[in-house]
């Protein structure tokens, strides 16, 4: 699942992403951000790892990536205003798309998933 969003005035493709709310676990945040940006409820099933991403403005982000299964579309919700659309695309469709990626990490995460590098959610702890 990919979201189409506007970044610096350009429509780009990205995975649902966001931030942690106070007292929220990474897994809870991943499910919440997916719901807010796509209106899809999801079960987070595995962890793909962490990537350090430095944005063009110099800010450094730690990006945690997860595997999820979309379980239910919530048609009572309105997705975040920053999201143009939600797309279901294979890797090949993504590469053939004329829409740019928000960052190279988008394709890297897909490649990690295809390579089978996902690990148990037990690795992600919230104390």
Regions found by a protein language model. Give the residues of each.
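N-terminal strand-loop-strand
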Residues: 1-15, 42-46
């Amino acid at each position: 699942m990919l979201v189409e969003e506007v970044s610096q005035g350009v429509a780009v493709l990205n995975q649902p992403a966001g931030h942690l709310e106070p007292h929220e676990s990474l897994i809870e945040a991943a499910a919440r951000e997916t719901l807010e940006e796509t209106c899809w409820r999801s079960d987070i099933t595995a962890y793909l790892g962490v990537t350090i991403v430095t944005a063009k403005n110099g800010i450094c982000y730690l990006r945690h990536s997860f595997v999820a299964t979309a379980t239910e579309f919530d048609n009572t919700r309105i997705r975040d205003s920053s999201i143009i659309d939600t797309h279901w695309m294979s890797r090949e469709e993504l590469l053939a798309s004329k829409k740019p990626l928000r960052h190279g990490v988008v394709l890297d995460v897909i490649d990690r998933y295809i390579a089978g590098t996902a690990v148990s959610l037990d690795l992600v702890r919230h104390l």
